[in-house]
């Protein structure tokens, strides 16, 4: 991939206009063949890989010729088996050709995405979850409303192919992509599956589609923005995963659906801030309610105008930060008033005015966390700890280390909240679940386990938190923890928990609107 990327840097025009000959390079299929073996070896025994499954250029011609009738929508992210093409054709070469197709398409996309970041000197972009929380802490207190949007999950395959034509001039190179999309869409497995956010099908190919689709939506959206600021960010190699980033917007022009050249609203200096966590964008706005309604309407017609997608109204929700909470990313986000006493002394009198400032107050979702722990069999639905039976075959140290890792991840991720009392209820559940698991393993009771291990039970488990001053082991540390907010650098470890909880929240909203 790096070799192809270097060739593309030397001559980007050749890269954009003549991608099709890359499909007939033996090195390309050798790379995809090795990559497929590396991925499949972890899930499939090597004896299942037949030596007769060989790649040939005839396979490419077959794939190009299988353009199906374009009368359905393609579901990009569905919960189905990891290898839909292999399930349907039972062939080894289909996955290798799909890997080769991904390698070819990644080259111009990587060059285009990096050049767009370097050329847009007026955009401020960060692509890390570590920048999201400080951004929310800095920008949300100065906003009064937010728009909670959701990226649509389905798109017609032909529309997706035509969007590729905007930056790939070599039309024949898109024939294999069109064939793969229609072939995947017409498979019977995909017509009966529910739509989810995280792609599980051919991780490299569908992650590329996800990154491209999000990048295309945002590039068109932010092409309408003027007078913004820009900050360079680190590149992500040959495959840019645009997972988390935010942008600061100072000017936006809203265009009519019927005539894109006629502006119907001009929002000057509205102080709009855009942040995206995974596939969930959030727009913070400081302005009147009319401004919020205009931006919400713009987001709804934007997808219909450019991608011919009908967006349900509940996919773009508006909230007032002073009254309601927003659920992202893994927090209940709200803004609270923080009174400050300012002592002013003159020669004659002493004045103590009260200044009211806004402050972001992320709330730990205790009840959803307990529900997720109940799903993983650490407790029941009411929060009563139970033993983890699937771990009783492990050693005592492994059991303690696993519980310790769960608590450490939870404590790190939610350390940004001032109110951490609910976290110690989670700690209590994990401690008793750990003790019950050990008691079940040794066929004894919790009292016997605690008597035999003594203080070693609590020294081995949940000991990592002692390294942090924010934990209230003393009154001084407790007072300091109420004034300080610490975002730890390893918070991405808890992303699966935040994503699972976010899916539950999205499902509740969809069910509410379906009723």
From Swiss-Prot:
GO BP terms in the entry: mRNA processing; RNA splicing; tRNA processing
GO cellular component: chloroplast
Database matches in InterPro entries: Domain_X (IPR024937), Maturase_MatK (IPR002866), Maturase_MatK_N (IPR024942)
Places the protein is found: Plastid, Chloroplast
GO molecular function: RNA binding
Record carries keyword Acetylation: no
Principal subcellular localization: plastid
UniProt keyword annotation of RNA-binding present: yes
Keywords carried by this UniProt record: Chloroplast, mRNA processing, Plastid, RNA-binding, tRNA processing
UniProt family annotation: Belongs to the intron maturase 2 family. MatK subfamily.
Protein role: Usually encoded in the trnK tRNA gene intron. Probably assists in splicing its own and other chloroplast group II introns.
The name this protein goes by in its record: Maturase K
Organism: Pinus uncinata (Mountain pine)
Phylogenetic placement of the source organism: Eukaryota, Viridiplantae, Streptophyta, Embryophyta, Tracheophyta
């Amino acid at each position: 991939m790096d070799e192809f990327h270097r060739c593309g840097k030397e001559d980007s025009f050749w890269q954009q206009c003549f991608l099709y000959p890359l499909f007939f390079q033996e090195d390309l299929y050798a790379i995809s063949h090795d990559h497929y073996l590396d991925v499949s070896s972890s899930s499939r025994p090597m004896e299942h890989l037949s030596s007769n499954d060989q790649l040939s250029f005839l396979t490419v011609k077959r794939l190009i010729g299988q353009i199906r009738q374009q009368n359905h929508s393609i579901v990009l992210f569905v919960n189905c088996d990891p290898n839909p093409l292999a399930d349907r054709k039972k062939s080894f070469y289909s996955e290798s050709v799909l890997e080769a197709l991904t390698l070819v398409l990644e080259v111009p996309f990587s060059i285009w995405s990096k050049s767009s970041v370097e050329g847009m000197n007026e955009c401020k972009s960060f692509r890390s979850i570590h920048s999201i929380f400080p951004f929310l802490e800095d920008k949300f207190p100065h906003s009064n409303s937010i728009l909670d949007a959701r990226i649509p999950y389905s798109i017609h395959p032909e529309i997706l192919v035509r969007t590729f034509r905007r930056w790939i001039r070599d039309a024949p190179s898109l024939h294999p992509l069109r064939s793969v999309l229609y072939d995947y869409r017409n498979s019977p497995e995909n017509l009966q599956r529910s739509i989810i956010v995280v792609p599980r099908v051919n991780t490299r190919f569908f992650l590329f589609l996800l990154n491209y689709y999000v990048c295309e939506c945002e590039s068109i959206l932010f092409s309408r923005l003027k007078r913004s600021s820009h900050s360079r960010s680190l590149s992500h190699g040959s495959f840019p995963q645009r997972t988390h980033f935010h942008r600061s917007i100072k000017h936006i022009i809203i265009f009519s659906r019927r005539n894109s050249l006629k502006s119907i609203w001009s929002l000057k200096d509205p102080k709009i801030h855009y942040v995206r966590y995974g596939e969930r964008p959030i727009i913070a706005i400081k302005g009147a309610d009319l401004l919020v309604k205009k931006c919400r309407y713009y987001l709804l017609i934007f997808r219909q105008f450019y991608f011919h997608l009908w967006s349900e109204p509940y996919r773009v929700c508006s909230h007032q930060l002073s009254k309601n909470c927003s659920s992202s990313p893994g927090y209940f986000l709200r803004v609270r008033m923080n009174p400050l006493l300012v002592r002013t002394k003159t020669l004659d009198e002493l004045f103590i005015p009260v200044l009211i400032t806004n402050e972001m107050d992320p709330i730990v979702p205790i009840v959803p966390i307990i529900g997720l722990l109940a799903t993983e069999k650490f407790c029941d639905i009411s929060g009563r700890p139970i033993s983890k039976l699937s771990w009783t075959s492990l050693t005592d140290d492994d059991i303690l280390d696993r519980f310790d890792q769960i608590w450490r991840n939870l404590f790190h991720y939610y350390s940004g909240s001032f109110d951490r009392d609910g976290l110690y209820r989670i700690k209590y559940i994990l401690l008793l679940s750990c003790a019950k698991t050990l008691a079940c393993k040794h066929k004894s009771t919790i009292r016997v386990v605690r008597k035999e291990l003594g203080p070693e039970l609590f020294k081995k488990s949940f000991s990592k938190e002692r390294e942090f001053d924010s934990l209230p082991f003393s009154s001084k540390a407790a007072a300091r923890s109420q004034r300080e907010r610490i975002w730890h650098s390893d918070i991405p470890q808890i992303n699966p928990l935040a994503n699972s909880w976010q899916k539950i929240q999205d499902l509740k909203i969809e069910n509410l609107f379906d009723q």
